[in-house]
Amino acid sequence: SFGSGELVXGEXPXFEKIIVKGIDAEVASAPMQVML
């Protein structure tokens, strides 16, 4: 999912939901910050 999220930067909300389902939100915070 990380690869898809990085490719689709505009899908931040959808990407966040996917991460929450697959991985803890805390873990998702790091990649999200790097993307921004």
From Swiss-Prot:
Residues 19-36 form the Peptidase S1 domain. It is found in: Secreted. Its main location: secreted. Inhibited by SERPINA5. It comes from the Eukaryota. The keyword Membrane does not apply. Keywords: Blood coagulation, Calcium, Gamma-carboxyglutamic acid, Glycoprotein, Hemostasis, Hydrolase, Protease, Secreted, Serine protease. The gamma-carboxyglutamyl residues, which bind calcium ions, result from the carboxylation of glutamyl residues by a microsomal enzyme, the vitamin K-dependent carboxylase. The modified residues are necessary for the calcium-dependent interaction with a negatively charged phospholipid surface, which is essential for the conversion of prothrombin to thrombin. N-glycosylated. The keyword Metal-binding does not apply. GO terms for cellular component: extracellular region. Its EC number is 3.4.21.5. Forms a heterodimer with SERPINA5. This is Thrombin. It comes from Salmo salar.
